[in-house]
């Protein structure tokens, strides 16, 4: 497993965008570039800034299709205007965006000895 972000050209007009997330796993998105539009399959995590990778490949308008509603597939959706997600997965997306679900995920990281650093908001005047 490559431990870096990269764009891999699979064939003419088809690309894999690899994102190495939190030092523990790769997540992937796929871009298919047509003559008038491009189709992005999944958008990884919201922190990815996946649009910057897409813009390195094409300037065409981009439609997004999510394979399912888990946050590692829909996290970057807000960077795009047209998103396709099944109705059933809309509810899943909500569950996976829930604070308690995210808290459970972080707890799982800690159990596996993954370093989790907490940020605190400190007001200064």
Which residues fall in each region the model found?
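Conserved beta-strand hairpin/beta-sheet module of binuclear metal-dependent hydrolase folds
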Residues: 5-55
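Short N-terminal signal/transit or membrane-insertion segments
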Residues: 4-21, 97-113
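Active-site HxH/HxHxD metal-binding segment of metal-dependent hydrolases
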Residues: 47-125
